[in-house]
């Protein structure tokens, strides 16, 4: 696909100009970090974050506990301090023209504090939040032994995480009982999605987002469309990478275990020239040679990098990349068992899987199933059968350049360019015993997309109470697919289409009463321009159909909170409407069969719209050792897009079905969570979510429940440190019964799958070499209870073991 360098040229112009911007005299922030007994804490990591999120830099304390940030501009910041064996602490600080000093005393027994940037697009402490946000940091990921962002999110409140098989298999995230594509995925605050995905989401790459150089993951539950645009109807997941700065640090890690799993990871970060230059980089390799059925091979190579320069304390240029290359062996989709007689219409069928031994015999024999040529027993569905020559090759690239300048103490601006590319190829040969048969020759389907985004943003501080953010965003997305096979006279077909959009956004954040009162109001207007599709090979579809651009999107968002300092109680409320433009595939998607296109899309589709409300209370007790949270949520999907049967007068003659507009459903429920730190060596976290998620109208089986949603979700994470060097973490997730979208003998039947409990145990031992170097040895048992369960008919791994070591400096 062609690349448009215009935005790059624009930012490079500022790069040439930046060194000549008049520099203010450099400021500094210094101080000392101590423990509760006023003893110095050496090796503590301190991160300074600008309130407008334009700067994030890190230093470490010296042997006497002292620290110093140099070459920083005057202004408002949050300072985050963390050290092994202590609770993470966040302090607000205003750096004045003559510098500032801030001493920090760390607590050994308290709930970790965090700096959050996803809720408002600016840096906030936990006490300042007016929305429901969960943070999982790098230390928690290490204690749990997680290498996948998908598994990291499994214990977050309100989230239902599914993976269709073993490591590297397709995954999904559902927030508060909504659909998986209702969650926006960000990398360092930049939207990450695939324009060639059916819904234009990041679903196809969720399982390829691995822990490479990750600092933390932030999860916003509730509408975020006014800040982050399309696909943020239900929530936002923001993967924040290491921002570099400070002394050189890094890690080298190797692990291996069950399922033929091997993983290697290296990362480094630091700064130079007194932190005028800051950088981070990471490389990860995941290989799975066996998988669940012995032939589920997976390979993933991931790269992350950041390089930036502070020309002056007020002028910064940075660039970042995140890329992945992957291979995944695919199985057949689960299907109903031949010979199973469907019950009367409207009946929910309890899913019963075919015996695993019989499934292996069927796969070895390689003969298509009939009602009489296998031993069905009492099974009514067949889990994913092995398909020896079905595979997917994929890759993505996300790269960004950002230029930021602070004009004075009240105004700054930033310009950024972001490019996201994605390419997926599916190849399926004649082997296997699929329910719909196998191709005579290897079929090839390639789906590629690229998205270019240019953003200009201004932040204005109006007095000490208001921060106004306003900006413009231009986005161009292109989607193309290609279909062929390896026959002697291969057919070929392709489709290409482009869409552009212009968005204007604004947000005002108000803080009053010594920052105890927080009010945020946001608005976004987005306009779309659609080109005509380009078909080649086979007769084109959508002839005579008017190609109208989607209507303008107007979204608003408001949140408010008040913190009662005397009782450490916070009340909060959040309301927002969401919007999702029809994807390019939903409007023009087609499949190529027998030398012709079969249309699935509808160029006339209306966008999806929603309204969401939530409110809650956060209570801190026992001098910060206990934090309780309760949230009620309500989301109504006013208009949705789904697959169905078009009317007889459908202009595109979609005889096999297609995408249509429907009235949406709703989800309402509660989220409860508790964090407890009874002592410096023990941490507990538990959450319970009840989500009553219904469609507007029952399906053919008479079921109202949203496909894939579990009404009850419980999570638990318990960490115990022993003698400072040994730690053990137990994490558990339990979900109730659910009914996914799943093939059935007739459209009048709906399968119900049993809920499950997944428990993991990770233990580690850290061996210090000196003050800055250490070795860590660890082992993890996943699904430690060895439960047999299925995700939408795909068999999950039983009990597995992984062990490894890491060297940290």
Predicted regions and their residues:
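Membrane-embedded beta-barrel scaffold of Gram-negative outer-membrane proteins
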Residues: 269, 275, 410-428, 561-563, ...
